[in-house]
């Protein structure tokens, strides 16, 4: 048993609704920080960590031992691991998507058996163009390949347009969902200046997914971005109101141009930034709203057998 979606709700392996409250960590670029950063993120109250991995397309490939290590660290710290391949970011090419899918299949021995603690975010922000039809065609093609390989995990699919074109999910999400023989696919919007720029945009983008009975997470968001402000207060409050998960971007290590998105000044989380304090200690933040998956709680959600 593992995570599954039913309607617009994600459930854990014990059949309890699970609302992600977590943080992104750029593992692919800072491979030696996992043993420091992952426990530090858990200490902030995160129930989920989204882990950036590389399939070798743009950065040094993360091998199967690395995947085992980061999943184990997440589990030890009672966090669900959302694993994602970052190399296809913003790319429209089908070959980039296929490479990510081939990577998950290559790594399946580290993933199979972890369905209760791991969610597979197939490819970060694949399909940069604002074209929902071509985006959907790609995922309709590859989701069955993952299932044929024996990966039964909940799958997460980022919106087109660098994750910021939720119209792609509004128009074609149902088609992508129906392409999954297990009907265990959820969707992710990345809320920066376009998808999260003001309160009405935030609310409408969330409503138009969950009103179709599709499960949603805000897989990345910031407080501002290259071309404008982000309404992080509404992202947090409306996510809490609607039971929508969120994963803030990102723990540390953003390049100089985007270092305002660092949540912490150090990998160990001794010194949070203003952004970090907002996410951890602010209204509707981690301390207020994050609850661990029942697969990690002492009574295992009322089930006597602990997860293996």
UniProtKB/Swiss-Prot annotation:
It catalyses: Random hydrolysis of (1->4)-beta-D-mannosidic linkages in mannans, galactomannans and glucomannans. InterPro entries: Glyco_hydro_5 (IPR001547), Glycoside_hydrolase_SF (IPR017853). Keywords: Glycosidase, Hydrolase. Signal peptide: none annotated. Residues 287-297 have a biased composition (Polar residues). Catalyzes the endo hydrolysis of beta-1,4-linked mannan, galactomannan and glucomannan. It is able to hydrolyze mannosidic linkages that are flanked by mannose or glucose. Its EC number is 3.2.1.78. Gene3D superfamilies: Glycosidases. The keyword RNA-binding does not apply. This is Mannan endo-1,4-beta-mannosidase. It is an enzyme of class 3 (hydrolase). The active site is at residues 125, 220. The keyword Hydrolase applies. Belongs to the glycosyl hydrolase 5 (cellulase A) family. GO terms for biological process: glucan catabolic process. Residues 284-308 are annotated as: Disordered. GO terms for molecular function: mannan endo-1,4-beta-mannosidase activity.
């Amino acid at each position: 048993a593992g995570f599954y979606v039913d309607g617009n709700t994600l459930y854990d392996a014990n059949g309890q609704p699970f609302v992600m409250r977590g943080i992104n960590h750029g593992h692919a670029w800072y491979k030696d920080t996992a043993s420091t950063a992952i426990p530090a993120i858990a200490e902030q109250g995160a129930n989920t960590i989204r882990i950036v991995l590389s399939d070798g397309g743009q950065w040094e490939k993360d091998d199967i031992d690395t995947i085992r290590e980061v999943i184990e660290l997440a589990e030890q710290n009672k966090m669900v691991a959302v694993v994602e391949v970052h190399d296809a970011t913003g790319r429209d090419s089908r070959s980039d998507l296929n490479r990510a899918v081939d990577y998950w299949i290559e790594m399946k021995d580290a993933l199979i058996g972890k369905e209760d603690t791991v969610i597979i975010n197939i490819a970060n922000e694949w399909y940069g163009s604002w074209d929902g039809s071509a985006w959907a065609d790609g995922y309709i093609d590859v989701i069955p390949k993952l299932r044929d390989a024996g990966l039964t995990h909940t799958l997460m699919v980022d919106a087109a347009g660098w994750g910021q074109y939720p119209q792609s999910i509004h128009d074609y999400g149902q088609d992508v969902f129906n392409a999954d023989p297990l009907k265990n696919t959820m969707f992710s919007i990345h809320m920066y200046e376009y998808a999260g720029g003001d309160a009405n945009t935030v609310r409408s983008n969330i409503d138009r997914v969950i009103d179709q009975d599709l499960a949603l997470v805000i897989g990345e968001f910031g407080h501002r971005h290259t071309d404008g402000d982000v309404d992080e207060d509404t992202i947090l409050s409306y996510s809490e109101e609607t039971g929508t998960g969120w994963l803030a971007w990102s723990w540390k290590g953003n390049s100089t141009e985007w270092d305002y998105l660092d949540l912490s000044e150090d990998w160990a989380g001794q010194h949070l930034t203003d952004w970090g304090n907002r996410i951890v200690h602010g209204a509707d933040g981690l301390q207020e709203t994050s609850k661990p998956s029942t697969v990690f709680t002492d009574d295992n959600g009322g089930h006597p057998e602990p997860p293996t």
